[in-house]
UniProtKB/Swiss-Prot annotation:
Subcellular location: Cytoplasm
E.C. no: 5.3.1.16
Keywords: Amino-acid biosynthesis, Cytoplasm, Histidine biosynthesis, Isomerase
Biochemical pathway: Amino-acid biosynthesis; L-histidine biosynthesis; L-histidine from 5-phospho-alpha-D-ribose 1-diphosphate: step 4/9
Gene coding for it: hisA
Origin species: Pseudomonas fluorescens (strain Pf0-1)
Record's protein name: 1-(5-phosphoribosyl)-5-[(5-phosphoribosylamino)methylideneamino] imidazole-4-carboxamide isomerase
SUPFAM superfamilies on file: Ribulose-phoshate binding barrel (SSF51366)
GO molecular-function term, one example from the UniProt record: 1-(5-phosphoribosyl)-5-[(5-phosphoribosylamino)methylideneamino]imidazole-4-carboxamide isomerase activity
Domain of life: Bacteria
Major location (coarse): cytoplasm
Length: 245
């Protein structure tokens, strides 16, 4: 399982939100490229970038920062989400050297777009499913739909989606532990690999994901925990690599 540091971008800075609320953000660095360097030097094997402004505006806003990080680390797998609603935007990021593009709101509102994107950019598409109480949220988490996460995930199995990033909104940024039971249920219910996100606080949460014994959970995204020092990227990755269960 991969430990994937998150860099959330708001107005060009690296921030963390609590439960997806733009008004409840903590700025951790005004130099996201240097922050990326910190996690790379700490041994991370993939980075998770989010254009928060883009998620709310429906188009890329912090694209220059994303491009700068991708250029600095051309061999590092990078995934980007936030405001990706067109094939043109996906093409822009892929050409910039981004490995994976995360489709969130657009995947919920227009599932056929995911199939189209997978055909155009095979192996590059991740679906981001953000949920509250099992129901999918959209538009920067401002809207809660009537769509069940597991039902929607199954719809994408035939499209060739690389993975699903599953975020539990109630947990995100709160460092109170991730929703292991639902993450495991989602990974067990779909053929698509799942990356867990939201609420990871320490090594115990990483162990809980591994203890679920679901092969489909291939990664864990961590944000506030690594910024506030309750989780060490290198230590967590080493723990995953040596985990025997």
């Amino acid at each position: 399982m991969l430990i994937i540091p998150a860099i959330d971008l708001k107005d060009g800075a690296c921030v963390r939100l609590r439960q997806g609320r733009m008004e409840d953000s903590t700025v951790f660095s005004d130099d996201p490229v240097s922050m990326a360097a910190k996690w790379v030097e700490g041994g991370c094997r993939r980075l998770h970038l989010v254009d928060l402004n883009g998620a709310f505006e429906g188009q890329p806003v912090n694209g220059e920062v994303v491009t700068a990080i991708a250029k600095r680390y051309p061999t590092l797998p990078i995934q980007i989400g936030g405001g990706i609603r067109s094939l043109e935007t996906i093409e822009h990021y892929v050409k910039a050297g981004v490995s994976y593009v995360i489709i969130g709101t657009k995947a919920v509102k227009d599932p056929a777009f995911v199939a189209e994107a997978c055909r155009a950019f095979p192996g590059k598409i991740i679906v981001g499913l953000d949920a509250k109480d099992g129901f999918v949220a959209t538009d920067g988490w401002a809207e809660i739909s009537t769509v069940q996460v597991i039902d929607l995930a199954k719809q994408f199995e035939a499209d060739g989606v690389s993975s699903i990033v599953y975020t539990d909104i109630a947990k995100d940024g709160m460092m109170q532990g991730c929703n292991v039971p639902f993450t495991a249920a989602l990974a067990a219910a779909t053929k698509i690999p799942v990356i867990a996100s939201g609420g990871i606080h320490n090594l115990g949460d990483i162990k809980s994901l591994l203890d679920a014994k679901v092969p489909g959970i291939i990664g864990a995204i961590t944000g506030r925990a690594i910024y506030e020092g309750t989780l060490d990227v290198a230590e967590a990755q080493a723990f995953c690599d040596s985990y025997q269960g």
